[in-house]
Amino acid sequence: MKQNILKKYTELSQKSHLHFAQQVEEYLTTPEEETEDGSNVIDLPFPGNATYNFNTRLKDEDMQPLSISFMSYVSNIRHIDLSYNMLTDKGIAILSKLLEYAENIQTLNLKGNKIGDAGCESLSKALKNKAKLSYFNINTNVFGNLGLMSINELLYKNEALKCLNVGCNKYDWDGIISITSALKTTNTNLEVLNMDDPEYKIQDQHFFAHFGKMFLSNTGLKKLSLRLHMIRWEAVKILFHHLRNNATLLVLDLSGNQICFQSMIYVLDYLSKKSVLRSLNLSRNKLYDHGVKLLGEGLKTNTSLEYLDVTSNKVTDVGFVEFGMRLMENTTLKALKCFWENSWGNKSIKVFNDYLAMKGKEFYPDFTIFEDEQHELNIAYLETHMPNEEDYLVE
């Protein structure tokens, strides 16, 4: 199968006077792959950010010979990774003709290209009703509201879709509301959603009520990332108020927002009640000392949170003392990230040294505390990873 595809691809590339993509040849000369039932499978694993692909990233003109070459074996395609290439709507229109017949496709990664609204429309039409498509990543492209609305159609048509990454594009609330509406009324199958860094024309905190209402009725979503949404205290109040009635969301990433210490009273209220969140990322916000004090207060009685990130919040020695003393009463936290872009002092280092001794070996902080040559306690960064850490993060 691979030999036949390579022969066809070579002929078409030479005929079109195109640069021969070395990564395509290398993949097609590797041994055939088989599924458990013995059938052959074929992938398109050509990410442009791989070291050996960087200088031969795929362009629109490469899609024609590539798509035609694979068309004879389109039913064998399972995974396509064309991330970090140079594809625009023109190249995506050609790829979509292949995708239309790829009935067994399971994952599609188009992150880091230049796909606009028209490309999203082509993809939506080609991918609708694909019964095995479970993962779709179109992060870091250039589409806006119309493109996101086209992608949103997959939430109504593709029941197998579990992970959707549409972050870092140019949509605003019109596009976002189309997604939250689908998850509020129809779709209960999607488990992971990344909507990082939209391009707001108007930022009204009350629009986050659309996420809140989604929390009330959605029973499928387990992971949500809302990095870089300019979230302030009003939105925090809305989100955590509605989260109290949600029993399925386990991982929430709110890093890189404008969450201030006043917001933490609502987080405290949520955490101190019957919460289910297992992972909360509040890094790169504005919690300061009082914010982590309130956060620690909520964690005193919390029994669900296992992963917490509060790096880059300008916490000082005073705040860490208050935070650490409250963490002493928590029994479930397994991983704590708080070293970078905060300020430690002798008192807080002593408190956290006692905290680490209490937690024991099955704890994964991003710091270590040691005794220096002057027999004084000091702190340093330590990279640690808890088992199955990917379960606590959003891609």
Task: Please identify what each model-predicted range represents.
Residues M1-E395:
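Leucine-rich tandem repeat or coiled-coil scaffolds
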